[in-house]
Swiss-Prot record:
ATP binds at G11, T12, S13, L14, D15, G16, V17, D18. It comes from Rhodopseudomonas palustris (strain HaA2). The lineage of its organism: Bacteria, Pseudomonadati, Pseudomonadota, Alphaproteobacteria, Hyphomicrobiales. This is Anhydro-N-acetylmuramic acid kinase. The keyword ATP-binding applies. HAMAP family: AnhMurNAc_kinase. GO terms for biological process: 1,6-anhydro-N-acetyl-beta-muramic acid catabolic process; amino sugar metabolic process; peptidoglycan turnover.
């Protein structure tokens, strides 16, 4: 049975709440609906930053000492307001929505200690919006020994299947770190980080010319990549490791950057990101026939050109070119995961989070 679901996502950047509507049965995506955004106020951001600092001392996932209780109330209200504004703007009645997927705000994620904490009161949210709310998606995976992330690959698979193409297909998300989802048409999924995404490049560009990023890859387009440095950097042991594998934004900070001109440095680090993505291909079960690029890197035209060169003969295209929304993808994913959780379908797999068997997850709060 097809359901109309709303997904809600509040990410680590603490910018605000993304909202997206999706029609799905938890296996297939029938339609992608509108999306919206409710920014956090400066006061709310400050409160969340304090909550992140205070959460480092937590040893129980249900504890809300001090500022955490206040932050949880603020997160819940912000999400309720986001849903109310979204349904009003799009002239949707609450009764037309079957389920809301509520990720909450992660304040602590320590999978080695089997502890992941997302704040947000799902019961209060369900009452406020008068729609059932699926929440607490990561807890079961972490309790079973998984990493509790990534959870979006199962949604990537549904999107890829909707293309009706022969595979394998790889969805590449180029954020601060780059990660991939490998989809071969079977039920198994492989997901992992591939290396630096925009983080090294953005940091270099900021130091070199004071801009936060290389807009459309214009600076890199004027430079020449340092191929010797790239070859050395790709000798880092991470690139030979088989998936699943993950890293942090700062794991490559120790690579010694040379005294490049701004354009040559941007060209080198853009090519390094592309080369790191290409380095995963020999570690996959079969060579992919197409790559779909999402995240900020998809808007970098030089990055896209370099990826096409590195990944040929496979097809390389941006998510937006396929009618997917790079900006709404995570919110859509949690609408999709809510439908899956309702049906007891797996949300995570051994080759995505490292959990020992496919795991469902999520708890249901009724209004």
């Amino acid at each position: 049975m097809m359901m109309t679901a709303i997904g809600l996502m509040s990410g680590t950047s603490l910018d605000g709440v993304d909202v997206a509507l999706i029609k799905t049965d938890g296996r297939h995506v029938a339609a992608l609906g509108p999306s919206g955004y409710r920014p956090y106020t400066e006061t709310e951001r400050g409160l969340l930053r304090q909550a992140l600092a205070e959460a480092t001392g937590l040893d129980r996932r249900d504890a809300r000492p001090g500022i955490l209780a206040e932050a949880e109330r603020a997160v819940t209200i912000a999400h309720a307001e986001a849903v109310a504004a979204f349904v009003a703007q799009n002239r949707i009645t609450a009764g037309a929505i079957d389920i809301v997927g509520f990720h909450g705000q992660t304040v602590l994620h320590r999978p080695a200690a089997k502890l992941t904490v997302q704040i947000g009161d799902a019961q209060a949210l369900a009452k406020a919006i008068r729609i059932p709310v699926m929440h607490d998606f990561r807890a079961a995976d972490v309790a079973a020994g998984g990493q509790g992330a990534p959870f979006v690959p199962v949604y990537h698979r549904a999107l890829a299947q909707s293309l009706g193409r022969d595979g394998p297909i790889v969805v590449v998300n180029i954020g601060g770190v780059s990660n991939v989802t490998y989809i071969d048409g079977n039920d198994a999924l492989i997901a992992c980080d591939t290396g630096p995404g925009n983080a090294l490049l953005d940091d270099f560009v900021f130091r070199a010319i004071g801009k936060p990023f290389d807009c459309e890859g214009r600076l890199a387009a004027q430079g020449t990549a340092d191929e010797g440095w790239i070859a050395d950097a790709l000798q880092h042991p991470f690139f030979a490791q088989r998936p699943p594998k993950s890293l942090d934004r700062n794991d490559f900070a120790s690579l010694g950057l040379r005294d490049w001109s701004p354009a040559d440095g941007a060209a080198t680090l853009t090519a390094f990101t592309a080369g790191a993505i290409a380095a995963i291909v020999p570690l996959l079960p079969k060579p992919p026939t197409s790559f779909v690029i999402t995240g900020g890197g998809a808007r970098n035209l030089t990055m896209m050109r370099m990826l096409r060169e590195q990944l040929e003969p496979a097809r390389v295209e941006s998510a937006d070119a396929l009618g997917w929304s790079a900006d709404a993808m995570e919110a859509q994913a949690f609408g999709f995961l809510a439908a899956r959780g309702l049906k007891g379908l797996p949300l995570s797999y051994p080759a995505t989070t490292g959990v020992s068997f496919p795991m469902t997850g999520g708890l249901l709060a009724r209004p």
